[in-house]
Every structure is written in C-alpha cells, then in structure tokens.
C-alpha cells in the first residue's frame, strides 16, 4: 500500500495520458511509495478536456466533480496540478479551508499555475492558505508568466517557490525534482507514522 496518493490534474486541452508523459522525469525522481493518480477533466462538451472555459464556464461542474472524487475514497493525500490544473489545485486548496470544508488533503503542488480571476472566488482567497504548498514557475514561460505563478504562491502562508529558466513545462532536472521529492518524503514519513500509531491504538 502506498504511503501517499497524489491526485494529478492536467492542463487545458491536456489529458491524464498527456500529463503522465509530461511528468515522467518527475515521477521517476519522487519517492517510490507515492502513488500518482492521473484523471481526465469531466467533459464539459464533446471532445473537451478543459477544467473550465472562458468566463469560467464549467467551473461548477468541475468543482462538484472534484468534491465527489476527493470524498469518495480511497483517500487522496495531496494534489498536483499543471497549468490550468494548477489553478484548479489552488482553488481546491482554498475550498479546503472554507468552513465547513468538503475537502481534506494535506499538501498541494502547482506548476505553471495562476490565480482565478472569477469575482466569486475572491472570498476564497481572503486569508492566506495554510496548506503546505510547492509552486514551480519558469522565467521564460510565455503561456503563464512567472509573475502570475508568483501571485498564486503569495496566496499561501508558507509556499516553497521553485524557479527555473525554462518555459511552460514540468521540468525534469534535479534543481526542480529534488526539492519536490524532499517535500513529498516529509509527508510520506508523516503518513507512515500516523498509520503506525493508529495501528497500535487498535491493538487489544
């Protein structure tokens, strides 16, 4: 049984299969006891793989889908998102801290992310988000400029920000993968210790 299960959310017009390829080098570098759970966005129209469209059309459907997925089990310990999937990860992190919250997960990793501009979402980011987070941004990113990813990171209380010289990609070099692997290892140890404690409490 894996110590951690991480939900992986693809970018706009991406897919689970595409994200698996994009994450191949990162996946090889992270702890072996982390299970990566790749999913496709709920189809908002025929042949569509976006989480929402212009004007945030489809957001409500995606939100309800994500809440159901995260609540249905087996457990999801954290969320990884790329591009629009990273923006969705930020929104889910904000929903996690609403009260009462429909979501429970322990960390968030966002690559090439940005903050929602939907007026209805402003209240979700009224306070700094406390969920531990990693934010990866490329200084040469022409699709989601680095400043937008840094603005998303600023919504979090204690973000780990990793900058790289490249564009709108999931980097596979050690300068990026090593700190992410270390971040995940911390949660892997925490989860393992928690399960061991739960097991000892259940012994007669």
Language model segments and positions:
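Conserved alpha/beta-hydrolase "acid-adjacent" motif
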Residues: 17, 142-148, 171
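Short alpha-helix in the alpha/beta-hydrolase fold that links the catalytic acid
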Residues: 21-24, 122-123, 145-154
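Gly/Ala-rich beta-loop-alpha elbow adjacent to hydrolase catalytic centers
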Residues: 80-89
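Acidic catalytic loop of the alpha/beta-hydrolase fold
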Residues: 116-117, 139-144, 168-169
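Short beta-strand/loop motif that positions the catalytic acidic residue
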Residues: 129, 134-137, 141
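Catalytic histidine neighborhood in serine/cysteine hydrolases
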Residues: 154-171
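Post-His helix in hydrolase/transferase enzymes
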Residues: 172-186
